[in-house]
């Protein structure tokens, strides 16, 4: 409804509930600014929350139904007004609202006031009072002959108990009952009225306690029936039914500010000294665990106690309160002995609470886990003794019952005793205490009911007392109100369900009152407006599927739990019942009650619903010597009582409907079911030995209902056993539902009257009205539901005059004419409503669609009704009426304002018009002139600017055109210049090549001619001195070990021998076929050898021949190769000269490879040999001449010569190996002569056979079979395996040893039968080469003069035949790529690189699969990490695996051994758009490794799983972090592989463009990754360095190196952080690698771990002593390492600590290569000098 500015409205307020406010203004979004009148402050609030304020309603209403605009705000305001004037009672219809004043109000309950409410006709004239409610109930019973009920509800402390007592006093006074009944044979001179009053102190003492909210809080529900004789309506009897006694208050109170039941404090602090001594009690409550509380609270309780009522302000002590209870018990015909037994039971409960338990220990002080009675306190033993004494059984038996539990065995009658734990014993103790009190309370209630029967009833045929069936009753229900605590359990669920049932009944009652009002006014009434909470109630009590039924079912399950119960609730009612709410919190559910939404915690529901005590404890109590205790737990008497009550119930059910269900059948005691808040036990037998009368329970098999779980029949022991089990299955919820249904059934059969008690404040202060607290209670008790019911109908009801006076302002807008002489308010009101209603419907028709129109016209109720005296208006029409009124008032105000504004403006206009007319004329003329001039100037400026812009545009276009022409001209010039230069370069290159070719041919022809001439001369000399040569050869074969440096004659002999052996070469012989069979010397050869002599002419010939050999060796060293023509001429020449043939012993492992051109630059040395300890690197170039350059310190295995087995490039691209014949020189410091020692470790030489010199040339006779033509040569660096190059006269020594031996082999020209050697061996392919020269050997001889290395001593082993050497050299020879062209060589390399790339991709896919299958999927399935951490740790690893799998399939698609059809470039180009994933993966890598380290520290399951994976053979011992970094490492390797593929791919190959494009893309990605970029650059430098060493390209050990690499198993890799500055060392085991740091526990732990696995620690190599091997990073365990085999066949990997160490190593590599190049250059110069000297000689 629209409100005007300045209107007074009701505004919601958090503290005051509602406040009056004045509207100041409207804001955007329906926000209203209101000034609160009481608080003088401004707030902004939504317009929808404002409630209408009617000044006529702002006054004191005794009946709030009279309020016209009934709302929450006006109800709250009216109650506050009346409370301030001490008017605590207010009507709202037939509901009485009572507010607790917390003070005495004078004469409010005096006899005079009571007498005013004796006449029913004076009720409306008298103010509201609780007497009026009692009077209305009494008169209704009298006049209608119908039972009545008065329901009193409200929260604790609102005055419910006092209200019930007030009603009881009124009814007793009104009935004028006689003091006794003459028909009662047991006339005790006590009237029923007195009995009813005397029962109140007993019930309050045993059922009330002090809480923080109420000093006399009833902890149970009570329904008191006061019966009246139908003849004279005098009180004739009474009965009490109790509900939900709070038994948990016995053992567990919320805090020290809450006390236990009053009776305990009366007994402790009010009993006499003799009584305390007899009961063993002390007068201090703090000495009892069940009573201990705050001292201030106990003192306050003593002051406020008044005769047990607890409600007064007297100063009576507790002895008087205890005495009042005793007197009340005696008045209930309870004998003194029975009273003593009651107090004895109470004392036993207190002593029982002081029994403490502790864990029992065995003799050796070990904990057994079972409980025992605490022996540390003497008070515990005293309490145990007192409990046994008071309850009437032996102490030891009771003790065993608390400590042990009996279990039935599988056999017949077998029972086992099982000790209990401490908590179980404590639970048994507390359960026993609660059971004793609850059953004692029920027994007292039963005795009170029996007393009521004795005073009013008569004996039946069986001698018992029965009530008359035709009596009427008035029931007073004192029930707990709605509860919504911070923690709500099963107790609150049952309480709120009770209030739901009562609210349903209340709604029905209000509905009937509304119907009555409508019928009086003649208004049609529809039941569709009824507010019903039936669905909410069915949610609780629906059979089989209700909340309580499901709870009972779950309690019967063997493994039932609250979790499964909640799952059943959610499955059954989630999204199917609007009142059930599924909550997010664990173990909770929500219910939408009429008073608000409540969240319940399900913890402990099953135990509370069962609420049992051990059977042995109950059996022990039933056998007590105490009569009271025995009667409380005697099953036979209980069953008898059940049978009697069942018979009474059956007879009562046959009575008429008006009185049968509420007459004397209900006077038997009705005990309450237990609960933890208001609780008493069910199946445990913890309640009164009584039955509830009435209809049979749906949970019980008989017509009666046993509260304690007793038997319906006790005819036999078997029946007792079976029935006991059956009754024990009845739960607390089942008892509660049955009792509640009976109560509601009883109430529904009566006329109900309501009293809603309100607590004005929380602090229980007088004259303090807390609006917000009162408002919440009004909602909880259902008062505001009355407002809702009215608003569902016609909430606005006014008489005709009031309506006309308010809405007569809209008559003009409605065009309604009024007859002022005769005004008919009824007709005018009707005419106004009809016109407004018509407009309202028209507006709805314009706004709504056709469906909504049909709904309005057919389904909606009439918007107004006109009664006899009132007008009933709906909310919608009322809002529209108020809007029309507002619009009418606004329209009137606007018209008035417009009229006065018009007059004012008109007068002002006339005054200003004449004075301004002249001035306006002048000003306008001057302004027009200036405007014209300004327009002319602006127009000129505009034209000038346009002209300039046009000229500027033309100029720029011309400049652009000229620039374009100039650019085209320059491009043409550059293109022409480029073509010209290319043509010139091409011509110049061709010219130079032709000149070089001509010069080379010329020189070769000259040399060939000169060589032929010399050979012709030598042939002549050979013929003359042949006999002399033979004799000298025989002498040389018998020589011992010679020293070439000390015997000049040896040189002469060598020269002669060399000259002689050159005459038997046969170049046309077939290739040498392994093995070479040695031939025996013929007799002719022996005689020839013996006839040879030494003469000056012979020496001259030998010198000439030696110079020829030196020239050949020099040509080979400097790359001089013969052309095809010269080769043919040489062959022809050799054929003419008896077919000379040469055998070359080479160190090339790749023999058979085509011989590349030799360059003038000497090749650097290869890395040191394999099969040895690492050789240290020289620190700089300064130590190049050091004799210990290649020395190895601390080599325990061997000294001297070592060889190189393999050498690796980065990755697997160019892993090479050297020849097994390579020799290394090393001075032996152990020998005094300082002579170097030579050793070979590749061939199987014996110590007696001298080593074979690398690249030596021997001539062989043509008579050797299998040698037909020369084997192609391999150019050998002068420094390769280079100790020979540094030795003086080493070549001469070699020739000395080899020439005679081989010469002797060639003396015979006729084939003969071969002789089998004693120790045959084969000649390795790596020891024989096909074409060579003696230049390298000659250079070694020449360089001896400038070398500082001592001359080596070569020892010769004596040999008597030529077979020894041949036997030693007989090794297999493999065929090589003879005459291979460059294209074929490139093709071969391309195949190897592509195969390497496929293997690399295969390894990569395998590693990615390991990450996904071994790590990612199990971690995700086992939920070892969160989803976020898994995404951060593994990033795009699954996508990368899929992509690379597709790449591998594409590469392996064509099984082409030549790799011609494999499109490497196109394959990688197809996946290039995924390359950016590597950038993302790399940027996330640091965070991933950080998460990995953190989770390994704090996440034990994750850490254990990683350790488990380390032991998995699939992972090869690599940790997870090594696999995580593999994608970035792999993308860094691709550029090298792609570049190598491009290098050996022809330009016309179809895959070449794709390769170049993908190379650019991958390189760009790699460059963007900082770490990968650094690694790639470092790899490239190493590749460039190794490319500078000659001979590496011809080595083919790539597959062998890969095999070695993959065989190495990495067990564990420990990575150090960047902050660690400790030096790193690599510890090696059997193929197990561990990277650690010094000074940490990781090292010792790892070593101990390997020792326990019986793994031997083999080596420890610091960086300073490492081999020449390289690892770019400690993480690159697979991609940048070289595996070196030592004697123990372990794997060495070098890991650098930092970039400085790596840079130092890199410099050492450079220095070594430069040193080797310089050494080669010096040796080449020495060879030239040697040749010059020989020629001169």
Curated annotation (Swiss-Prot):
Residue span, DH domain: 1389-1572
Instruction: Name the SMART domains on file.
Output: MYSc, PH, RhoGEF
Pfam families xref list: Myosin_head, RhoGEF, SOS1_NGEF_PH
Q: Using the record for this protein, list the coiled-coil segments as residue ranges, or answer none.
A: 926-1039
Q: Which domain of life is it from?
A: Eukaryota
Q: Which GO terms describe its biological process?
A: actin filament organization; endocytosis; hyperosmotic response; hypotonic response; pseudopodium organization; regulation of Rac protein signal transduction
In what ranges is there compositional bias, type Basic and acidic residues?
947-1028, 1121-1131
Q: Where is the composition biased (Pro residues)?
A: 1071-1081, 1162-1171
**Keyword Coiled coil, does the record have it?**
yes
Q: Where is the Myosin motor domain?
A: 59-886
Query: Which residues hold ATP?
Result: 154-161
Q: Where is this region: Actin-binding?
A: 754-761
Q: Which InterPro entries match?
A: DBL_dom_sf (IPR035899), DH_dom (IPR000219), Kinesin_motor_dom_sf (IPR036961), Myosin_head_motor_dom-like (IPR001609), Myosin_N (IPR004009), P-loop_NTPase (IPR027417), PH-like_dom_sf (IPR011993), PH_domain (IPR001849)
GO MF annotation terms: actin filament binding; ATP binding; guanyl-nucleotide exchange factor activity; microfilament motor activity
Main localization, broad class: cytoplasm
Limits of the PH domain: 1603-1714
Q: Where in the cell is it found?
A: Cytoplasm
* Domains: entry comment: DH (RhoGEF) domain interacts with Rac1-related GTPases.
Protein purpose: Myosins are actin-based motor molecules with ATPase activity. Involved in macropinocytosis and remodeling of actin cytoskeleton.
Q: How does it assemble?
A: Monomer.
Instruction: Please state which protein family the record places this protein in.
Output: Belongs to the TRAFAC class myosin-kinesin ATPase superfamily. Myosin family.
Protein name, as recorded: Myosin-M heavy chain
